[in-house]
């Protein structure tokens, strides 16, 4: 058994080997390997399945009482400086290993069909395997330096995958935007790592917290400097997990293939920031100001993401802002000290959002032959509608993911989100109010997405009639006269259900979307009076002082407010976007008669629409203030460099040149001329002196 634990590094090694094999094949045999497309995906999936089985084995060993395993090797030795690499296996690590590998396997199986006809099919699996290996290496890292190395590898793979279709300008711009934004966070992370090494003399997670606590106990730490280092370190997770104000890259990252959105932007890369904050949680707890910044950053991000998602027309971008909002919930939980609730929501959200993204990919895949392959058409919810009758399995699984994200029992996200809501209210009512209000918005925009996509009448055949489609408001007025659209008789294309290879991951992911939430709930009293997840996390290196878990019935009773708010949001979405039953039509006509109310609602809806369309005006502000301001500053610097600095140097050179040319004619080589010149100058000097 000990031999198996000494070889934990096999988990990231297998997907890394798959990436290396496909990369070598593409480099040396580019034409031959394209004939073995299925074999390439089989290698990637098989190797990742081995890593997944190993992850489940390590997870089972950890939760059944196996001690924490930590293996280190000396990497750099210089005098008293020792830099070690290795791996750390505790319950938190094992949970993340299972999470990453299970979602990655489902995404790879799904991609086998989704990307099969793409020219970069093998390259896609090569990048995907490398990304998975990098994320697994990050999870296993025992110190900050190793985390930083894999952190950068994850960022590099994200850049490659977001810009996978780089010939499309929007995709090329999106991957550059993600890269530059994350560089800001990564620079802060590096400064924070170096700062804490300056304070404690260690990069190791366990030693770092222990030494920091000892120094803090003896008042040997400058709290201002320590707080500054912690905020710099927190800047890395802010960028990686798309927290305000470095969230702007996430919606544009939807330009990548949809399976990438399910893997990177649901369960892995964006979760890396949450994981790092959880790893550094014992240290952050000693700095109350930093914890306050973390909690408020999470709350603002949750609310901002929800408000921007309210009127999105792009299916994937709506889910992207939803991801941003839910990541804000996780950060809020960690900031208020609710360690278990934050990680609990990380787990439940990962499976639910992966299901939603893969479901959106199935929808987009079926819409592309009808409306075209450009994202502005195939991902536009205005051209969808009524897909439930054509894609019933996709619709049901998407509905399950929607119900989970809205916090409806007994789906997974209900248990974790409600715990965050209650804890945030108890910690500080203002934070709790923001969290509860955001929960209502989440229910509204998620069912808005569902109704626009799967309910009503199919609108895909009207995509080329711009004038008539412009009359279809995205704010609920989706009734239109079918007779006013004259369909071409040749137009017989309708969406089709995805094939079995794409449906298999959707069905499998439905299982954790429904049941994974039960790991955080106490159904019957045990000796420790604690739920399974809390017990597992107490065995981790980041053990925390948990309070007794609420009993099942008590938990449900406390969840009544959050569920009520969620149902209220669903009812509003149903009223605006749901099937147009006769009684709803009558109610809408009654409201239309009240002109004052109608004007107020219309002005409010226009404000919300503009807020969502212009992304809360944040992107425009960054573009005007930073990008245009930086370009203007560069022009000024360029002008100074060219005309002042270079002008002085060039002026001296020109003056020397013409001075030399002038003296060239005076110097004739005759001594009599030199004597005459000297005497003449002396005469002028004495004459000047005499006059003065």
Swiss-Prot record:
GO terms for molecular function: NADH dehydrogenase (ubiquinone) activity; quinone binding. Pfam families: Proton_antipo_C, Proton_antipo_M, Proton_antipo_N. It catalyses: a plastoquinone + NADH + (n+1) H(+)(in) = a plastoquinol + NAD(+) + n H(+)(out); a plastoquinone + NADPH + (n+1) H(+)(in) = a plastoquinol + NADP(+) + n H(+)(out). The chain crosses the membrane at residues 9-29, 39-59, 89-109, 120-140, 147-167, 184-204, 219-239, 258-278, 289-309, 327-347, 354-374, 395-415, 425-445, 503-523, 555-575, 643-663, 671-691. The keyword Translocase applies. Its EC number is 7.1.1.-. Belongs to the complex I subunit 5 family. NDH shuttles electrons from NAD(P)H:plastoquinone, via FMN and iron-sulfur (Fe-S) centers, to quinones in the photosynthetic chain and possibly in a chloroplast respiratory chain. The immediate electron acceptor for the enzyme in this species is believed to be plastoquinone. Couples the redox reaction to proton translocation, and thus conserves the redox energy in a proton gradient. NDH is composed of at least 16 different subunits, 5 of which are encoded in the nucleus. This is NAD(P)H-quinone oxidoreductase subunit 5, chloroplastic. The lineage of its organism: Eukaryota, Viridiplantae, Streptophyta, Embryophyta, Marchantiophyta. The gene is ndhF.
């Amino acid at each position: 058994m000990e031999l198996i634990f000494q070889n934990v590094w096999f988990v990231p090694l297998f997907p890394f080997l798959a990436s290396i094999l496909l990369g070598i094949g593409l480099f040396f045999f580019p034409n031959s390997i394209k004939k073995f497309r299925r074999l390439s995906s089989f290698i990637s999936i098989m190797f990742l399945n081995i890593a997944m089985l190993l992850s489940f084995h390590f997870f089972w060993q950890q939760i059944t009482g196996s001690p924490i395993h930590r293996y280190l090797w000396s990497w750099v030795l210089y005098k008293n400086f020792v830099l070690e690499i290795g791996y750390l296996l505790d319950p938190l690590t094992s949970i993340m290993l299972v999470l990453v590998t299970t979602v990655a396997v489902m995404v790879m199986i799904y991609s086998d069909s989704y990307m099969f006809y793409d020219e970069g099919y093998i390259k896609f699996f090569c990048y995907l395997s490398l990304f998975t290996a990098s994320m697994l290496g990050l999870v296993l890292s025992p110190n900050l330096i190793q985390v930083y190395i894999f952190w950068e590898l994850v960022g590099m793979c994200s850049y490659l995958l977001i810009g996978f279709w780089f010939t499309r300008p929007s995709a090329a711009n999106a991957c550059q935007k993600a890269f530059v934004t994350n560089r800001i966070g990564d620079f802060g992370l590096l400064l924070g790592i170096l700062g804490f090494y300056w304070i404690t003399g260690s990069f190791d997670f366990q030693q770092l917290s222990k030494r920091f606590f000892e120094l803090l106990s003896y008042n040997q730490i400058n709290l201002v400097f320590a707080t500054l280092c912690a905020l710099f370190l927190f800047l890395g997770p802010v960028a990686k997990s798309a927290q305000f104000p470095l969230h702007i890259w996430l919606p544009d990252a939807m330009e990548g293939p949809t399976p990438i959105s399910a893997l990177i932007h649901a369960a892995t890369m964006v979760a890396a920031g949450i994981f790092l904050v959880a790893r550094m949680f014992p240290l952050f707890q000693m700095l109350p100001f930093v914890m306050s910044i973390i909690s408020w950053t999470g709350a603002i991000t949750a609310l901002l993401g929800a408000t921007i998602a309210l009127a999105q027309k792009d299916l994937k971008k709506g889910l992207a802002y939803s991801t941003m909002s839910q990541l804000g919930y996780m950060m809020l939980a960690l900031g208020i000290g609710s360690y278990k609730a934050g990680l609990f929501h990380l787990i439940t959200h990962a499976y639910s959002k992966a299901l939603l993204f893969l479901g959106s990919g199935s929808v987009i895949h079926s819409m592309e032959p009808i409306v075209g392959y450009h994202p502005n058409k195939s991902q536009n919810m205005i051209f969808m509608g009524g897909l439930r009758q054509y894609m019933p399995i996709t619709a049901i699984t998407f509905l399950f993911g929607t119900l989970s994200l809205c916090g409806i029992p007994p789906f997974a996200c209900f248990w974790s989100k409600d715990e965050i809501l209650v804890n945030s209210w108890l910690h500080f009512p203002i934070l709790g109010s923001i969290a509860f209000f955001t929960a209502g918005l989440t229910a509204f925009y998620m069912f808005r997405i569902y109704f626009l996509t799967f309910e009503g009448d199919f609108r895909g055949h009207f995509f080329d009639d711009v004038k008539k489609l412009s009359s279809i408001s995205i704010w609920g007025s989706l009734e239109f006269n079918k007779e006013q659209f004259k369909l071409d008789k040749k137009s017989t294309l309708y969406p089709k259900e995805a094939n079995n290879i794409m449906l298999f991951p959707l069905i499998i992911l439905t299982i954790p979307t429904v049941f994974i939430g039960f790991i955080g709930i106490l159904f019957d009293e045990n000796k420790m009076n604690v739920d399974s997840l809390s017990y597992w996390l107490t065995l981790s290196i980041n053990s925390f002082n948990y309070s007794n878990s609420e009993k099942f019935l008590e938990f449900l009773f406390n969840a009544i407010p959050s569920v009520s708010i969620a149902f209220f949001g669903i009812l509003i979405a149903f009223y605006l976007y749901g099937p147009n039953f006769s009684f709803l039509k009558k109610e809408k006509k009654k409201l239309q008669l009240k002109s004052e109310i109608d004007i107020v609602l219309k002005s409010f809806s226009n404000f919300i629409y503009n807020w969502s369309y212009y992304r809360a005006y944040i992107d425009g502000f960054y573009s005007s203030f930073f990008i245009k301001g930086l370009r203007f500053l560069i022009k000024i610097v360029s002008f100074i460099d060219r005309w002042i600095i270079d002008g002085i140097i060039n002026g001296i050179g020109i003056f020397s040149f013409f001075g030399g040319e002038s003296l060239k004619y005076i110097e004739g080589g005759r001594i009599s001329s030199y004597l005459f010149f000297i005497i003449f100058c002396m005469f002028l000097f004495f004459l000047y002196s005499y006059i003065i």
